[in-house]
Design a protein with these regions (language model features):
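Catalytic tyrosine of NAD(P)H-dependent dehydrogenase/reductases that use a Tyr as the general acid/base
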Residues: 9, 45, 128
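Active-site helix of classical SDR
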Residues: 12, 48
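A short helix-coil junction within the Rossmann-fold of NAD(P)-dependent oxidoreductases
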Residues: 14-23
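Active-site loop immediately N-terminal to the catalytic Tyr-X3-Lys motif
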Residues: 37-43
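SDR active-site lid
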Residues: 65-134, 141
Length: 160
């Protein structure tokens, strides 16, 4: 758990002072679709990715006055060696079924979509329709720069 979180915290702490001095910058965090909603069998992983999202949400607000932008990538199951090994050996059966429905994306698809979103000023990058719905459903207090996304979030929000 600590590995996923602190390997993002320490480099961020190192680069932020220099970015502030420079007057601009961008920090990108790699979370996961599993960091948007809790998944059975993924407790430590999901918790660490939720923590990254919380860190990104907070520092995005703190760094805005310094012209430093922040983005979060929440990729779905991605076709990598680690994923293939995990899928073949230890992935819970419920996740295998979800993967069959949601599909698997290539690392190239994930990278291209994130770079495009950064260039267009988006805070959150997701992949596919299921990822988009997750982004809308788990927006919370995260910044939103897309009018369409903001409308979808407002339309699906429950009143309390």
């Amino acid at each position: 758990m600590a590995l996923n979180f602190y390997t993002a915290v320490y480099p961020t702490r190192c680069v932020v002072p220099r970015m502030k001095d420079r007057g601009f910058g961008h920090i990108s965090f790699v979370s996961s679709a599993a960091g948007q909603f809790a998944i059975w069998g993924y407790s430590p992983y999901s918790a660490s990715k939720f923590a990254l999202r919380g860190l990104a949400d907070a520092i995005q607000m703190e760094l805005l006055p310094y012209n430093i932008s922040v983005s979060v990538l929440c990729p779905p199951n991605t076709e990598t060696g680690v994923f293939k090994s995990f899928h073949a050996t230890t992935m819970p059966i419920i996740m295998r079924k979800m993967t069959a429905v949601a599909g698997i994306v290539s690392p190239e698809q994930v990278a291209v979509s994130h770079v495009n979103d950064i260039e267009n000023g988006h805070y959150l990058t997701t992949n596919g329709l299921m990822g988009w719905f997750l982004g809308v459903g788990t927006a919370g207090a995260s910044p939103e720069r897309s009018l369409i996304q903001a409308f979808a979030q407002a339309r699906t929000m429950k009143t309390f």
